[in-house]
Amino acid sequence: PVSVYSEINLMSRLIINGGKPLNGTVKVSGSKNAALPLIAGSILCDETKLTNVPRIKDVESMLEIVGALGGEYKWTGENEVTINTKNLQSKPLPETARKLRASILFAGPMLARFGRVEMPYPGGDLIGARPIDTHTNSFITLGAGICSGESMCLSAEMLSGGKIVLEETSVSATENIILLASGIEKNVEIRLAASEPHVQSLCHFLTKCGIQISGIGTATLKIRGKKLPLKNSTHAVIPDELEASAFAVLGAVTRSNLVISGVEFEYLDSVLLQLEKMNVNFSASENSIKIEPPSKPY
């Protein structure tokens, strides 16, 4: 079946004829922002099984990069993929990585596994201060050397532990450092770390793989890595909290009877708080939110 997202990608514009209440149940998709670092993290293991994976272009592109490096992946269900990187090779990432900003997430695990990574600058950003500076500066702190040009090249004969204070609270930089640190058999501390749900999800995945991580969900992470490969693991991609929030607001503003299933309440505190402040008529069960028409105006 074709997803809503793939249909939208084929359109030049989207026209919505609204003004009507909705009725029914909608299931929240897996989070793209959580899935992409997990795919990059599969490089640290021989085999990884991911469930609740959104079938969207960025995910497919990320998997294709794994394949180009000598790994294998197979969709074993509609939203379930098994990734095997036992025979992964140390070679430059393909040119297609330039078109995917999330490809920067391969830098950390490739450097941890092979001591070297070469890849196109994501987005082709070569001029001025780059969004990846927080990544590369952190890698240098942990013992990597960098050579620049038309492609980004990092190498390290011996990676070290240490404390990193992020120049900005960058989600992708936090994830990249976590991935690199997981392959270093020393202590790494990250200060001013991002704490978004997908960062926490990556940490939980890596703890399943045998990595010691403390401070998950806070601005200070302490990581003790291990010799690679890490333990094989199965991990469910968390539901997309942004999508759940959007559906909740949609149900409220259209005064609908709408059930939003497959939600993760751990990451929805702020959304539920705002719904309460707006006097939205809703109820929460084990993994769903039910939005009902208001008994009085908002």
Where are these regions (language model features)?
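Short, structured segments at the rim of ligand-binding sites
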Residues: P1-Y298
